[in-house]
């Protein structure tokens, strides 16, 4: 069981990289992974407790902050409620709660209190990209 949690944590690091570092100008697109395995089903993957680690980079790619995060997701068959608690290396603690709806096999929409409008999610194979504007 411990091995599954470690693998899940490592996989989440990769997932968060895709979520946070992919921009509209990125050459890498989720569709590029449509025939790859294993398939990432985000609502299953994020159900329950997940631990994550990551970095924040500025536009030039310099790491400006690091974080660890505790995530807890609940999937009801239509909607994923994802609670995130970020612990930043400078001592800041930040909470966010997402409501994520699955539109179809590949598309998701999400909202959170500090997100402008709706987030758009795209899932193909093992890749998931989440595009949104965050209020800072």
What are the roles of these predicted feature ranges?
Residues 1-11:
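Bacterial N-terminal signal peptides that target proteins for export
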Residues 12-16:
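Hydrophobic helical h-region of N-terminal Sec-dependent signal peptides
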Residues 18-21:
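C-terminal motif of bacterial Sec signal peptides marking the signal peptidase cleavage site
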Residues 23-25:
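Bacterial signal peptide processing site
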Residues 33-49:
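N-terminal helix-cap/turn-to-beta initiation motif at the start of protein domains
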Residues 53, 57-136:
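Central antiparallel beta-sheet cores of small beta-barrel/beta-sandwich binding domains
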